[in-house]
Amino acid sequence: MKFKKIILALACLSSPLYADQDQQLKSEIQRLQHQAEDLQAQLNRLQKQLANHKSSQQKHEQQAATKPAEPQSKPTVKSGAAIEEKYHSSKVEVHAPDAHPESISFYPTALIADNRVVTYIAGTPVVSSPFLGDRPAFDGSDYIVNISSINRDVRLLQQRRRLYRAYQKIGYPIPNMPIISLSGKTEPAATFNNPFRSTNTDGDITLGSSELDVAAALNENVEAYIAIAYDESPPAIGPRVNNSAFNLNMGFVNIGNLDKSPLYFTAGQVYVPFGRYSSAMVSSPVTMNLARTKTRPVIFGYKSQGDTGPFGAVYGYRSDTTLGRSGVGGVNLGYIFGFDNDINGEIGGGFISSVADAGGMQSTGSNVGTTFGGFGSITNGNENVRKTKAADVHGHVGYDRYNLTLEWVGAIQSFRPQDLSFNGQGARPQAAQAELGMTFMAFNRPASIGVGYQWTKEALALNLPKRRYVGVFNISIWKDTVESIEYRHDIDYGITQFANGAAPQGFVNLPTLGTGKSADTVSAQIGVYF
C-alpha cells in the first residue's frame, strides 16, 4: 500500500515536467517545419534557374548549329588586336548586422556578389560628390569650388536642402550618414601687359589659382567646410616657386536647417558678408580688391525659407589693427527676387565698422622698401591705425540670357592722414563696378561675353587704377572647363596726385605717385573644375 502511494506521488510530480517537455518538442517541430519550408522554397528557385539555364543553353546551341561552318584555317590574330573578354552580371547584396549602427561599437559590413565579398565597409559609409543636389552644369559653374566666396555658408545650406528634398520626393529617408563633397579647381593663366611705370611689354605664365574644397554634410542640421588654396603670390626673396604652398583659405562650421527655421549660425575663417563682388572677368574687380575681408568671425544670419525673399546677417570678429578696441562688427541686408522665371536678381547693402582689415588694405603688392605695402606689411606698413567705417550697395538682375551687375563700396569716413592719405589729406577710398553679360552657344558649346566699367576714388595708395575698361569671352570647349580671354585697359591717377600710408615706427614710405598713363593687359586662362 505504501508503494502505491509513493508511485502515485511521483506520477503527480512528473506530469508538469512531461508537459513542459512536450511544449518544447512542439516548438522545435514547428521551427524545423519552417526551416524545411524555406529550404523547399530555395530548392524550387534553384530548380527554376537551372531549367532557365538549360533552355537558354539549348537555344544557343540551336543558333550555333544554324550558322555556316567556319573555315578550318583561322586568320592569324594581329598584334595589338583586342581580345574579347567574357563578363556576367550579378546581384550585389549588403551583408550587415541586424542591430542599428549606433547600438554597437563596431559595424562590419560587406558587399557580396556570387557568394564572394566584393568589398568591406568598416564603419559608417561616406558618400562623396563634387556637388550637392542637381545635375552639374557643363562648365562646372555649380561645383562647390565655384560657389561665391561671399555667403558661401548660406549657399551650402540651400544645396543641402535641395538634396534632402530630392530624397524625400522619391520616398527615401533622410541620410543618417555624412555626405562628403570633394571639389576643386586649377586655373593656369598667361598675361601680357605694358604697365604704367614701364615702357617695355611684360608677360608671365603662371598658375593663377588652385584649390581643394571639402564640404561635409554631417546631418540635416550641421555642415563643416574646408578650402585649401595654393598661394600664388611671389615671396619677398628668392624664386616664386619657393612660395608654392597650400594654406587654409576658408574653414567653418554652419548650423542651420532652412526647412525648420530661417535662422543659422556660422563660425570659422570666412569672408564676412560685406559686399557681393560678382564678375565674369578673369581679373578681380576693383570693388573686391578694395573691400573684401577674410577673417574669423561669428555670424548670426536669417535666410528666407523660400527661393526668394529677404536675407540678413550680423557678425563680429577681432581686428588685425591694434589702435583702439579690437572688436569689429557689421551687418548685411538684402532681398532676392524673381518674376515668372524670366527675371531674377538680388539687391542688398552692408555696413562694416572697419574696412582696414580688407585684403586690399592689408597688402597692396608693393615691393619691399618702396611705397606703402598695406597695413599688414612688416617692412612697408603698420597695424597701429584707426578703424574706419565703410558701406556697400549692390544689385544684380538677370533676364533671359542677359545679366547686369552694379556695385559701390567705400569708406564713409576719412582715414587719418598718417594711416592712409591722398594728396596730403586723409583718404576716403571708394570703388564702383558696372558689368553687362550675355550667354549664348558658340560652336555648339556654352559661351558668354561680358563688358565692364570700373572706377575708384582716392585709392592711389592701394595701387588701384582710377578707371578700368574690361571685356571677356568665355567658352566651355570641354566639359568641366572654362577657357577665357580678357582685355583690360587701365587708366592711372594724374601726375599731380600722390598718396601714402602707415609705415613701421621710425620709417617713412616712399610716396605713390600718379603717372597719368594707361596700361593694357591681355589675359588667357583655362580653368579646370572637379
Curated annotation (Swiss-Prot):
Keywords: Coiled coil, Signal
Coiled-coil region(s): 20-66
This protein's record includes keyword Coiled coil: yes
Disulfides per UniProt: none
Signal peptide region: 1-19
Region described as Disordered: 50-81
NCBIfam families attached to this UniProt entry: LbtU_sider_porin (NF033652)
Similarity-based family: Belongs to the UPF0422 family.
Protein name (Swiss-Prot/TrEMBL): UPF0422 protein lpl2888
Organism: Legionella pneumophila (strain Lens)
Lineage: Bacteria, Pseudomonadati, Pseudomonadota, Gammaproteobacteria, Legionellales
